[in-house]
Amino acid sequence: MEIKQYQIILVNLDPTIGSEIKKTRPCVVISPDEMNDHLRTVVIAPITTSSKNYPTRVEIKHDNKIGWIVLDQIRTIDKHRILKDLGKLSKPEIKEVKAILKETFVD
């Protein structure tokens, strides 16, 4: 499967430790295509359907459900954890993800 930045993928996140988000769930690919094409790992942010209004979370609508991209739990996973493709973020969602990533990790 070809993996692209801002793609939504179904990922098995188990096993986890402590407060890490667990289970098999949708995640957003954060790593750029150049990395995704050449490495056996990808950087992802999990999506949850239960969230508080944290400044590091982006609300999205996917598969007729409201969810939040959890940018405060970004992690690197092996591609073998990816189960299937679920779609892609919209352009406004991508713009908001970029803004929060920049504000959180760059500024």
Residue spans for each PLM region:
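Conserved functional hotspots at enzyme active or ligand-binding sites that engage polyanionic ligands
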Residues: 1-107
